[in-house]
Regions:
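Class I SAM-dependent methyltransferase Rossmann-like catalytic core
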Residues: 1-21
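Surface-exposed cleft-lining segments at the edges of enzyme active sites
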Residues: 2-3, 79-82, 120-121
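Short gly/ser/thr-rich secondary-structure transition/capping motifs
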Residues: 8-11, 57-61, 171
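A structural signal for well-ordered alpha-helical segments within the folded catalytic domains
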Residues: 10, 14, 71, 131-132, ...
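A generic secondary-structure signal
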Residues: 15-19, 65, 94, 137
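Short, flexible hinge/linker loops that cap or flank conserved catalytic cores
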Residues: 21, 41, 69, 180-182
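Conserved SAM-binding loop
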Residues: 26-116, 190
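S-adenosyl-L-methionine-dependent methyltransferase catalytic module, highlighting the catalytic core
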Residues: 89-90, 94-96, 100-196
């Protein structure tokens, strides 16, 4: 039964909204371009979608780089994708390589999360993250500079998410407390810097 918009989407959208000015020029988004349209608006000159299998503008593999050699964008929106890629470090490195110098990767990952049955059956689900693990993955990429890395969540929203509650079942104030002990969503804005 679909109860409505999941709790974690509130935080994902809050993060993207706070970095909306970075969603500009040529953009790439995993699976669909919902957030590019919602937060990029007129700043976006070209909106591409990426998928490993089908129904996308770009069919490519973030781990191997296959199908991605001709892609260069100003912004790459990658929400809740890394948990489903076993070699997440390679995928993150290739994601950064798709950016034009000065471009931005807007990345979100789950911290506290249940298993997604659909994704587990189709790709596998391998990871949950913390702010420290995500920071370390990014810092291992020489051309990547973390501009912002923040956590979202608290005990109430984490419990609600695990129980399958929807956003409308919580009060607006429930989302205002960010407790680093309950990292439901971690967001990072990462800039590609020129190589030395």
């Amino acid at each position: 039964m679909d109860r409505g918009v999941p709790v974690d989407r509130f935080y994902i959208e809050h993060f993207l909204s706070s970095h909306a000015a970075l969603i500009r020029g040529a953009t790439l988004e995993v699976s669909e371009n919902r957030y590019t349209k919602k937060f990029g608006g007129d700043r976006v000159s070209k909106a591409l979608t990426l998928h490993v299998k089908n129904n996308a503008d770009v069919i490519g593999n973030l781990v191997t780089g296959e199908g991605l050699s001709d892609i260069h964008v100003d912004c790459f929106i990658m929400t809740q994708t890394l948990p489903f890629i076993y070699e997440s470090g390679k995928a993150l490195k290739n994601a950064i390589s798709l950016l034009n110098p000065g471009g931005f990767l807007l990345l979100t990952v789950p911290g506290i999360t249940p298993i997604s049955r659909f994704d587990m059956a189709n790709w596998g689900q391998y990871w949950s993250f913390t702010d420290r693990s995500l920071r370390r993955l990014i810092e291992e990429i020489k051309d990547a500079k973390i501009v912002d890395l923040r956590t979202y969540g608290n005990v109430k929203t984490s419990m609600a998410f695990l129980l399958g509650a929807a956003q409308h079942e919580l009060k607006p104030g429930d989302f205002e407390v960010f407790d680093p002990a309950y990292q439901l969503v971690i967001g990072a804005a990462v800039q590609r810097v020129a190589s030395n």
